[in-house]
Amino acid sequence: MATGPTYRVKFRRRREAKTDYRKRLKLLLSRKPRLVARRTLNHCIAQIVLYDEKGDKTVVSAHSRELIKLGYKGHTGNLPSAYLTGYLLGKKALAKGYTEAVLDIGLHRATKGNAIFAILKGALDAGMEIPHGEEILPSEERIRGEHIKAYAEMLKEQDEERYKKQFSKYLEKGLEPEKLPEHFEEIKAKIDSMF
């Protein structure tokens, strides 16, 4: 560790790898609400956050657990659930009068077509205005879960036992992974009917 008079200790949240202050400052200078998109292995979280001197204020939020209450039977950490979480957030935000935002991905890596950008695509399709590049968004097939369907069909054909093990939670909940795209459309329609 460096010592001496020229050494400066970084801010606590930077040391804990929670905040990139340079990126945060650039986002705050836009003076727009931030669409904060975060992903864990099993869940997706999306929030509309406003800056305040005493601490940021979350005005609208959506969590992939809310999809379960709507009847979603798929995994809550995959690409279709990330899109639906963003879509739900977008509908909630528009209902509260927030029409535009800037995307805040925090310390997540900006990889083309990942779940963070599926959240963004969901918010855009709900009607929000968020600056973005079209090439970064995931394809419609991946958003609907066509890649999961194709993998499930291939696995069921080749190794029935592995198929049952891989998709045990889907089957336990009564959803065949081959029907995920249709199930996705049902949940999206339910979100539309709420607003």
Swiss-Prot record:
Q: Which Pfam families match?
A: Ribosomal_L5e
Q: Which domain of life is it from?
A: Archaea
Q: Which residues form a coiled coil?
A: none
Gene Ontology cellular-component terms listed = cytosolic large ribosomal subunit
Asked whether the keyword rRNA processing is assigned, the reply is no
Report the record's Gene Ontology biological process terms.
ribosomal large subunit assembly; translation
Any one GO MF term held by the record is:
5S rRNA binding
Q: Member of which family?
A: Belongs to the universal ribosomal protein uL18 family.
Report the function annotation for this chain: This is one of the proteins that bind and probably mediate the attachment of the 5S RNA into the large ribosomal subunit, where it forms part of the central protuberance.
Q: Describe its partners and assembly state.
A: Part of the 50S ribosomal subunit. Contacts the 5S and 23S rRNAs.
Protein name per UniProt: Large ribosomal subunit protein uL18
Q: Which species is this UniProt entry from?
A: Methanocaldococcus jannaschii (strain ATCC 43067 / DSM 2661 / JAL-1 / JCM 10045 / NBRC 100440)
Q: Which gene encodes it?
A: rpl18
